[in-house]
Each structure stands twice: as structure tokens, then as C-alpha cells.
Amino acid sequence: MQITDVRIRKIASEGKMKGIVSVTFDNEFVVHDIKVIEGQMGLFIAMPSRKTPDGEFKDIAHPINTEAREKIQTAILEAYEKAVSEEVVEG
């Protein structure tokens, strides 16, 4: 499965969440609402989730192995960094 599109919506407010992302796979399937979050060790992604009645968050969609997660995270963070650097050049 190939990542064929990554769309970034940057978040301008102060806080740990830096962007919301949609990723398209094989030009056929899209996953919306992946979050780019700034943690103590740098940027990482959080898959879309919902809050259960007991207050726990459960992923709606997520990769089932480490390789897939790393591939998705790398593509998202590269697109995010590119979007941020283009904003700096324009601004």
C-alpha cells in the first residue's frame, strides 16, 4: 500500500497539537484527523480516536505493525516540515 497524498492543516494556536492530517492510500482510501503533536522527544502522530463512555480514548483506525506506523509517521512529518518551511519562506 502506497501513501499517495498527505494534506496538512496547521494549527496556529499555542499548544502541543500542531496540525491535523489526512492521508490517502493508493488513491483509493483516506484516513482523516491524524494529529501532529509536539512531545518532549519531538513531533509524533496520533491516529484518529474517539472517547469511550468511561473516558478512555480508542483508535478508530491505526496501523497494525511498526513498519506501517513508521512509514505513515515519516510521510506525515516530512509533509508537515515542508509546509512549515514553505510558510517561513513566504512570510
Curated annotation (Swiss-Prot):
Cysteine disulfide partners in this protein: none
Pfam families assigned to the protein according to its UniProt record, in alphabetical order: SpoVG
Chloroplast found in the keyword field: no
UniProt record, GO biological process: division septum assembly; sporulation resulting in formation of a cellular spore
Alphabetically ordered keywords of this record: Cell cycle, Cell division, Septation
Keyword DNA-binding on entry: no
Lineage: superkingdom: Bacteria
InterPro entries: SpoVG (IPR007170), SpoVG_sf (IPR036751)
NCBIfam families: PRK13259.1
Function (record text): Could be involved in septation.
Family: Belongs to the SpoVG family.
Protein name: Putative septation protein SpoVG
Gene symbol of the encoding locus: spoVG
